[in-house]
């Protein structure tokens, strides 16, 4: 994957990216809504290695002007060949600047135009207001609420379920 927007580049991971990934994935505030929790350096290296090549599900988001990795986009097959899930995690230094929306919008375009997808979904915890604001901003609608569906330690998290169809995106 290689997608360019006005300010961003979305590409495949390179091993050298692990340090930038570790910078934000080691932050408990960033990772509080991610079931895997806070990353160690080894977790960050494994994450980057796992997401290289044809089976990648996560892609770095690069700020073009600074050639700086500012977060990553999640994009993978959710159901059949026609439905993918999208998500995002960003370094707190680059949050609230429209980067997540810009990257997500580019992924929607890629999914619908290049991959001929029918549907793209996204999920988040109800407390993760910034994430579902991005979902709304890119045209997704809330389709559901799943009670206690994601295990996190000894707890269960609730989730909102958002989606957009190709015909709604156009």
UniProtKB/Swiss-Prot annotation:
Q: Which family does it belong to?
A: Belongs to the acetyltransferase family.
Organism classification: Bacteria, Bacillati, Bacillota, Bacilli, Bacillales
Keyword hit for Transferase: yes
Top enzyme class of this protein? Answer: transferase
Gene that encodes the chain: ynaD
Fetch the PANTHER family from UniProt. GNAT FAMILY, PUTATIVE (AFU_ORTHOLOGUE AFUA_3G00765)-RELATED-RELATED, RIBOSOMAL-PROTEIN-SERINE ACETYLTRANSFERASE
- E.C. number: 2.3.1.-
What's a single GO MF annotation on this record? acyltransferase activity, transferring groups other than amino-acyl groups
Q: Which UniProt keywords apply?
A: Acyltransferase, Transferase
Write the signal peptide boundaries: none
Q: Ranges for the N-acetyltransferase domain?
A: 8-167
User: Per its UniProt record, what InterPro entries does this chain match?
Assistant: Acyl_CoA_acyltransferase (IPR016181), GNAT_dom (IPR000182), N-acetyltransferase (IPR051531)
Name under which the protein is recorded: Uncharacterized N-acetyltransferase YnaD
